[in-house]
A protein has these predicted regions:
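Histidine-dependent nucleotide/RNA phosphoesterase domain, centered on the 2H-phosphoesterase fold
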Residues: 1-189
């Protein structure tokens, strides 16, 4: 991107223990795993955005994070997306908790208010575990069951810049705001 625009997205960042648990979930042989530090749950893919609008969004994210405490989110299943046989991703699908859905709706309203165009696909909470090669065949491991209970504890709402290079995609945090755990829930460790 040029100096006036960048590629951006907003995501929830799991804590380190959750990223380790997600990284340990089974994926198909030959899949390119997402590095643990890069595991995240995208709320809004923005794409190309002017720096000025990106700065405005960054200024509003901490207030949005403070307004939305989140419980731990259980992994419901492991799936291949978009669908077999054309799957490109292996994802951990997470429960669509009401608090998470409300946060996503608040973010969508903020993006509209700031005039920031975002992906209009329905919100499906997930974490991308791995990317599949173009010639991948097969089914999700264990019929999609994670094999053991995994709950994702979210620690931050983060605006990322997405950078493309010869080595692949990397994500650089622009601003990250803490998300409080919902009251009465102790995050699993």
């Amino acid at each position: 991107m040029n100096g006036d625009r960048l590629r951006a997205f907003v995501a929830l960042m799991p804590d380190a223990a959750s990223r380790d648990a997600l990284h340990a979930l089974p994926v198909t042989r030959g899949a390119r795993r997402t590095l643990p530090a890069q595991l995240h749950m995208t709320l809004a893919f923005i794409g190309a955005i002017e720096r000025e609008r990106c700065d405005a969004l960054a200024a509003h994210l901490p207030a949005l994070a403070v307004a939305h405490a989140l419980p731990s989110l259980p992994v419901e299943r492991i799936a291949w997306w978009p669908s077999l046989p054309r799957a490109r991703l292996i994802v951990a699908e997470l429960a669509a908790d009401a608090a998470c859905v409300a946060l996503n709706a608040g973010l969508a309203a903020l993006l509209r208010e700031l005039g920031v165009p975002a992906d209009r696909r329905p919100f499906r909470p997930h974490v991308t575990l791995a990317r599949l090669p173009h010639d991948a065949i097969g089914q999700p491991a264990h019929g999609g069951a994670p094999g053991r209970p995994v709950e994702v504890r979210v620690e931050a709402l983060t605006l990322f810049e997405s950078r493309l290079s010869q080595e692949g995609v990397s994500h650089r945090p622009i601003v990250s705001a803490p998300i409080a755990p919902a009251e009465g829930r102790t995050p699993p460790r």
